[in-house]
Amino acid sequence: MKKDYSIIVGGAAGQGSRKAGLIISKIFKKLGYFVYIYDDYQSLIKGGHNFSQIRISDEFIAGRREKIDLLIAFDKKTIDLHEGMLNTGGALIFNKNKTPEEKGIGIEADAIVKHLQGKPIMANTAMIGGFLKVVGIEWAAAKTVLEKEFGGKDNINMTIAKEAYDSLKELIKIESNKKTKNPEYLMTGNEASALGAAKAGLDIYYAYPMTPASGLLHYFAEHEKELGVLTIQPENEIAVANEAVGSAYTGQRTMVASSSGGFALMSEVISFTAMAEIPVLFVNSQRMGPATGVPTYSGQSDLLFSINPGPGDFEKFVAAPANSEEAAIWSGKLLNLAWQYQTPAILLLDKELSEGTFSVNKSIFKDIKKEKELTWNKKGEYGRYKITEDGVSPLAYPGTKNAIIKASSYEHNERGLTEEENEGVITAMQEKRLRKFEEMRKIADSSDSIKVYGNKKSKIAIVSWGFTAGAVREVAEKMGLKFIQPIVVSPFPVKQMTKALQGSEQIILVESNALGQLGTIMASHGIYADKKILKYSSRPFSIEELEDRISKAIKA
């Protein structure tokens, strides 16, 4: 029998519900479960309502359910908002000192903390300890995780958690899951993207904080020395992009990240990198727009903008992973591809992927390596934009003997000198870059640019991308349907998509935007969806919602 549990940990901003949810998730990871965490929070420092929805399973998961099995409430508002989500037989665990009139499993969290002379915030530790007892997790199994989180066995948090644990009785038993070897890490999409790029030789990371991309900056800053990546926060997004270009010009592998509006500020610089053939990896972690939109919530409405982010004809690599493993793999791939083809590359994330936490296999990082770019052999006169058969010119960097290295946003000749009069030179340089683009399209149409799951013989094909693809994959597999997930969205892998769709009599597209933007891209290549399932409320699809809407689309 499949093991699948959903838990909500909720409270006001500042009460520590998010941290508590992460600690609980780490304990379940240690017990052998796949874990997915959906974090929901408002743009507030204190007050309001935050919650983490944790889902654990003995199979890979990447979506949330509408119904839950356990509710851990730090305040009354959490009970009011989420108690109705409990399944029959589900349990409410609450802070009895905050809401004494509630029916459920009350923990004297505040009283325990006061008795042990702890700080008020440590009530969340008491809630964790009580929860562990209620679900039948042995103290010894959780102890090592708690000690690591709290800084040792003698920490007061350990004493608080143990007293709360001992104060309750076991209600249900969540057994350990040791049948298969499950992933070793829990990582957000931001953390995985950072580590993947670092493994591919990233030298410098530039960013100005903007939710939900800020986690990348935090991760690089915290792990700067061990990753060997210099981390810099300039004064705004325009400065971020320009400084990154300057560093890449000198041979330093650079990466920048922002979200939607901040990414928009970088658009002229992205076009500049295409003209100057300077490789930079850009990350756009989408929020629900337009403009400032809904800052701490999600959407997939930047797809068309991300594949057309600046003026002029230029190709770029754009990949949209669905989970943390794919984010790590593709941040590394894109960094290498940017340097191989001397072009901008864009990693397209969204809030749910950037800040969601997923199970990650340690082994994937072994295959992410720095791949060597084409460099000048130091023979003859150096031409930064030398016309070649495949359009890729050898690189040299400032300080190289007998080489003058120019970079300009103007059209130029092979030596990098501005050209406005000679139409032959202008045409030749445009065609040089176009040849490079043709090579890029071949790479984009490789077998790993699209994934196919589920029943590959099904006449019904579901297509989705980015974070939304995770939940859609789960539902499609359950319903016996074919599921197709394009990861590379520019250049669009037409051959691979056409091959994946062979035999399909109905194509259903699922996206978290109002216009069906992937559908627009597919249609531009002669591939049309029969039905579109769209959501643009800033919240992700649930498993139950997808089951219902896909069933209706099939019957319609």
Where are these regions (language model features)?
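Generic beta-sheet signal
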Residues: 38, 93-95, 107, 257, ...
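Flexible, glycine/charged-enriched surface loops at secondary-structure junctions
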Residues: 38, 140-142, 154-160, 171-178, ...
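Gly-rich Lys/Arg/Thr-decorated short loops/hinges at beta-loop-alpha junctions or inter-strand turns
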Residues: 169-181, 197-201, 221-227, 283-287, ...
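Thiamine diphosphate
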Residues: 2-66, 70-79, 83, 211-308, ...
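Flexible, low-complexity linker and terminal segments
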Residues: 187-190, 339-556
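Short glycine-rich or small-residue beta-strand-to-loop segments that form or flank ligand, phosphate
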Residues: 6-12, 129, 204-206, 255-258, ...
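Active-site cofactor/cluster-binding pocket
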Residues: 1-200, 204-206, 495, 499-500
